[in-house]
A protein has these predicted regions:
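Sec-dependent N-terminal signal peptides
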Residues: 4-14
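Generic anion/oxyanion-binding catalytic loop in active/binding sites
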Residues: 9, 28, 71
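Residue-level marker for beta-strand->alpha-helix junctions and adjacent short loops that shape enzyme
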Residues: 11, 31, 89-90
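Sec/Tat signal peptide C-region and signal peptidase I cleavage site
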Residues: 16-20
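Short N-terminal segments immediately surrounding and downstream of signal-peptide cleavage
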Residues: 22-34
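Extracytoplasmic "Venus flytrap"/periplasmic binding protein-like
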Residues: 22-24, 41-96
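Short, surface-exposed alpha-helical segments at coil->helix boundaries
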Residues: 36-40
Length: 96
């Protein structure tokens, strides 16, 4: 879980525009109480540094539903700026 947080922070700060303040859309499945609270820490830090965080939460399936949503966004040519994804799952996107 710590690796996921570090990956999200890294993506948040490297996937943004520097012209009008960083803006990021994050697809994730952290929707339960404790998960949402942990994600709020990242959101608040990003906002405190002038960023605009746009949530794309996907509930259910322990990330499986989020992976389906991510694939659909990629195929449609509208991927989010960052996505919470399990390490081995990213390899599936390379095969398509």
């Amino acid at each position: 879980m710590k690796k996921i947080i570090i990956a999200l922070i890294t993506l948040a700060f490297t996937s943004t525009s520097s012209i009008a303040g960083p803006k990021i859309e994050v697809l994730h499945w952290w929707t339960s109480g404790g998960e949402a609270a942990a994600l709020k820490v990242l959101k608040d830090d990003f906002a405190a540094n002038g960023g605009e965080w746009m949530d794309m939460p996907v509930t259910g399936g322990g990330g499986d539903a989020a992976n389906v949503a991510l694939k659909a966004r990629i195929v449609a040519g509208d991927p989010p700026s960052a996505s919470q994804i399990k390490g081995p799952t990213i390899q599936e996107h390379d095969q398509e």
